[in-house]
């Protein structure tokens, strides 16, 4: 067994003992990061230099303390993107890619206006901009730390990153009736929910919690979408897996939407709700 293989086996055992959900995958990704190679190339590395091995062991020790893998390597994958992440910004989750797939499948004008509310790293906005290069894509975020990451990730793209609070009354009235698609992965976890250490200790609370019932940001987003969307425009909002019915009710109670649909992610859990703006009378 090579030195690297031995080190990865030891790291896997360490991470498993620490309660990491995917110890082997994390060990291999940390090894690849330390060596500066793709994970698939690890099998071709026989004898890593001592500095790389020491760096790997340092990262494993940090991961065993439940520091997020993405913070340790500095990036997170989302759809077609690799995004810069770190302390102060919510790490994009694979579950949100189900919402992305739905959004990509929508029939929109070539020059559509798309708004991503609570953009965080810019994940949804940037992925949609890549799929729809002719669209105007606006990413809205109110956290200064998250805005830094969003602007960094959006550098060199056409995505417009705006600093604004999505719960503020009369936000951006110039968009009233002009938006084709609104998407959002907002703070939605009900206060008091039990979370893994990676989330509770390292994701910003501002990006996680949506008030006592998880709906404190979702309800204003529904009202905002009703104002911004053109007739027939589409909206998709992610929610906690315990609040699907509440999110459906928020759209239904607003009275400006039809085709309100609860949707699931790839694991089969309730994940987001979609709706269509009804025509104005």
From Swiss-Prot:
GO BP, sorted A to Z: methylation
Family label: Belongs to the protein N5-glutamine methyltransferase family. PrmC subfamily.
Coiled coil: none
MF-aspect GO terms: nucleic acid binding; protein-(glutamine-N5) methyltransferase activity; protein-glutamine N-methyltransferase activity
Name of the coding gene: prmC
Residue positions binding S-adenosyl-L-methionine: 141, 185
Enzyme class label: transferase
Keyword S-adenosyl-L-methionine set for record: yes
NCBIfam families to which the protein is assigned, alphabetical: hemK_fam, RF_mod_PrmC
UniProt keyword annotation of S-adenosyl-L-methionine present: yes
Source species: Mycolicibacterium smegmatis (strain ATCC 700084 / mc(2)155) (Mycobacterium smegmatis)
Name under which the protein is recorded: Release factor glutamine methyltransferase
Binding positions (substrate): 185-188
Protein purpose: Methylates the class 1 translation termination release factors RF1/PrfA and RF2/PrfB on the glutamine residue of the universally conserved GGQ motif.
Pfam families assigned to the protein according to its UniProt record, in alphabetical order: MTS, PrmC_N
Catalytic function, reaction form: L-glutaminyl-[peptide chain release factor] + S-adenosyl-L-methionine = N(5)-methyl-L-glutaminyl-[peptide chain release factor] + S-adenosyl-L-homocysteine + H(+)
Keywords annotated in UniProt: Methyltransferase, S-adenosyl-L-methionine, Transferase
EC identifiers of the protein: 2.1.1.297
């Amino acid at each position: 067994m090579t030195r690297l293989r031995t080190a990865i086996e030891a790291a896997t055992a360490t991470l498993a003992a620490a309660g990491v959900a995917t110890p082997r995958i994390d060990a291999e990704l940390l090894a690849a990061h330390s060596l500066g190679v793709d994970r698939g190339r690890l099998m071709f590395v026989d004898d890593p230099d001592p500095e790389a091995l020491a760096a790997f062991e340092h990262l494993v020790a940090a991961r065993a303390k439940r520091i997020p893998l993405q913070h340790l390597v500095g990036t997170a994958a989302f759809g077609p993107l690799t995004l810069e992440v770190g302390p102060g910004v919510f790490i994009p989750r694979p579950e949100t890619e189900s919402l992305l797939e739905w959004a990509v499948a929508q029939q929109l004008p070539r020059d559509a206006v798309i708004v991503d509310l609570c953009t965080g790293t810019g994940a949804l906005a940037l992925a949609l901009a890549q799929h729809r290069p002719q669209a105007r894509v606006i990413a809205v975020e109110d956290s200064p730390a998250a805005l830094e990451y969003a602007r960094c990730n959006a550098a060199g793209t056409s995505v417009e990153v705006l600093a604004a609070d999505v719960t503020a009354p009369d936000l951006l009235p110039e968009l009233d009736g002009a938006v084709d698609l609104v998407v959002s992965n907002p703070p939605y976890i009900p206060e008091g929910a039990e979370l893994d250490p990676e989330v509770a200790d390292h994701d910003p609370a501002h990006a996680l919690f949506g008030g006592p019932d998880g709906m404190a940001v979702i309800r204003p987003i529904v009202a905002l979408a009703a104002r911004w969307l053109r007739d027939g425009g589409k909206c998709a909002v992610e929610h906690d897996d315990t609040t699907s019915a509440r999110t459906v009710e928020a759209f239904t109670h607003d009275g400006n939407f039809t085709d309100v649909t609860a949707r699931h992610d790839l694991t089969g859990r309730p994940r987001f709700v979609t709706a269509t703006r009804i025509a104005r009378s």
